[in-house]
């Protein structure tokens, strides 16, 4: 389920967003999907589902190709403006500044990375409102049970989060929606959010785009540095929605990127020391890519 703060006109007979949500769990289970004839889905999206399934199945055969039975329709309803998913982090802030002229809405989600309690959620909303005010954008807040929904099927968030971002874009009927890249062209890996996948979730009226692959962490912060108010409002922490803790791996990685951009003052709750950087534990290929990028950038800067 989804709960929005804005009054968007939603067609109760359009099941496109629910098909997006159900696709990857159904592939994991090997269960076909049948959409009741009283509902319809986007013809463009239905056509692309075969390709989405091919990509997921090629990456991991545990995701079986399934049959979809649904009435399709060429959507022609009026779409809203351009939106971008935003949690206050480096990737979303870079996209906001890079595409400032196009973006009209910033979309903040509770139940995606975290299930925030009321106080934490209100803190996140207040922080994001500072950014929307500074950049003259509108805020869309979304609450969802995505985290529990995905966990119920034993799915990792990485597998299904492209589907849920797509479903929100489709449900809001945004004309264009940006999903921010977490890596670069040379560091791509199999993930539910990927440039080979994201555009395939588009409908006739909603174009979904994967953006930001041209910039690594340091490049992104170098752009954000030019907007001191946006920089001061960054939130990167894995551990606490209310602060940047200064202890988790994301905070420490951000600290290194800030140093590489000659930024020494940043509001971490606990000051980060160079010894903390040396003690980073590499838990996977994504962590290793960040460390390699930092080493390369530091070496270039002597």
Residue spans of the language-model regions?
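Beta-strand-enriched, solvent-exposed domains that form extended recognition/catalytic surfaces
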Residues: 1-7
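Extended acidic/polar, glycine-enriched regions
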Residues: 8, 14-23
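Nucleotide-activated chemistry modules centered on ATP-dependent adenylation/adenylyltransferase
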Residues: 21, 26-33, 39-85, 90-302
């Amino acid at each position: 389920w989804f709960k929005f703060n804005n009054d968007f006109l939603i067609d109760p007979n359009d099941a496109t967003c629910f098909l997006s949500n159900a696709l990857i769990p159904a592939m994991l289970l090997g269960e076909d999907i049948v959409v009741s004839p009283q509902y319809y889905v986007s013809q463009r999206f239905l056509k692309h589902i075969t390709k989405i399934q091919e990509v997921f199945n090629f990456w991991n055969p545990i995701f079986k190709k399934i049959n979809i039975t649904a009435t399709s329709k060429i959507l022609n309803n009026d779409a809203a403006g351009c939106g971008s998913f935003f949690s206050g982090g480096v990737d979303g802030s870079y996209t906001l500044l890079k595409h400032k002229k196009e973006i009209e809405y910033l979309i903040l989600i509770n139940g995606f990375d975290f299930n925030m309690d009321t106080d934490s959620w209100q803190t996140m909303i207040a922080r994001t409102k500072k950014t929307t005010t500074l950049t003259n954008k509108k805020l869309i807040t979304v609450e969802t049970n995505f985290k529990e929904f995905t966990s119920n099927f034993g799915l990792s968030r990485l597998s299904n989060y492209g589907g849920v971002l797509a479903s929100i874009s489709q449900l809001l009927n945004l004309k264009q929606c940006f999903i921010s890249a977490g890596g670069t062209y040379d560091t791509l890996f199999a993930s539910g959010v990927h440039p080979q996948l994201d555009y395939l979730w588009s409908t006739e009226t909603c174009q979904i785009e994967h953006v930001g692959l041209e910039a690594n962490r340091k490049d992104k912060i170098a752009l954000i540095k030019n907007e001191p108010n946006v920089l001061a409002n960054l939130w990167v922490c894995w551990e606490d929605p209310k602060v940047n803790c200064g202890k988790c791996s994301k905070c420490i990685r951000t600290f290194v990127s800030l140093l590489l951009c000659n930024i020494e003052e940043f509001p971490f709750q606990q000051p980060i020391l160079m010894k903390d950087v040396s003690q980073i534990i590499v838990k996977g290929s994504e962590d290793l890519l960040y460390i390699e990028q930092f080493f390369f950038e530091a070496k270039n800067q002597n």
